[in-house]
Design a protein with these regions (language model features):
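Nucleic-acid-binding surface
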Residues: 3-25, 29, 34, 42-194
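Glycine-centered, phosphate/nucleic-acid-interacting loop/turn motifs that mediate DNA/RNA or nucleotide
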Residues: 37
Length: 194
């Protein structure tokens, strides 16, 4: 590994085998660097340079590398990230296309046909749903998260002026999930007015 390649790997943070190959490091050389402890294997197919900085959201970066560019952090993980849920997620919840599968117990996959380019924010090497999409998805996933969690998340976000009911409604319409918002509209408005 040349000094230039090493600098590039440090800047990448978590990286895939394909990214290593793009800068001229073969799969075999990568395996050798792992044995020499110059590169750390985070999990299957995801690596990081031992001197690279570990951001707070390293789990999100790894998950997005693992599940590809169309995946995004969502569900309970996104609600917790935005401080809209008290429950600490036991898994990293990921929105993925319907064909994605995972054998790892670390992730909770939400296979969705809703567009994975709407209401998604890209930050520091990972993708996460916006506050509005997190709330709409919570209503959609009410059987897994609970209606109370979804209503509470909407109420907290609106009361703390993180978003508005109008923005949530607009996002629901863009995603084609406005029926979920309509179903819970009275509960949200009632909770806000209290």
């Amino acid at each position: 590994m040349t000094p230039k390649q090493e600098t590039q790997l440090k800047k990448l943070g978590p990286f895939s085998i394909a990214q290593a190959e793009k800068i001229g490091i073969s799969h075999q050389e990568l395996s050798r660097l792992v044995k020499e402890e110059k590169i750390h294997r985070m999990e299957r197919g995801v690596y990081i340079h031992t001197d690279a900085s570990f951001p707070r959201e390293i789990d999100f970066q790894i998950a997005c590398k693992k599940f590809g560019p169309k995946s995004a952090v969502g569900g309970l993980t996104a609600l917790f990230y935005y401080n809209l849920a008290d429950q600490v997620p036991g898994h990293t919840w990921m929105l993925v296309p319907p064909e994605k599968r995972a054998t790892s117990k670390v992730y909770r996959l939400i296979r969705t046909k809703t567009p994975l380019n709407v209401g998604i924010i890209e930050i520091n090497g990972y993708r996460i749903v916006s506050i509005e999409r997190a709330i709409i998805e919570a209503f959609k996933l009410a059987t897994k998260l609970g209606e109370r969690t979804a209503i509470k998340a909407a109420r907290i976000a609106i009361k703390n002026e993180l978003t508005t009911l109008k923005k949530i409604g607009k996002m629901a319409k863009e995603l084609g999930l406005d029926s979920y918002l309509t179903k819970h509209f009275e509960a949200i408005v009632g909770a806000i007015e209290e």
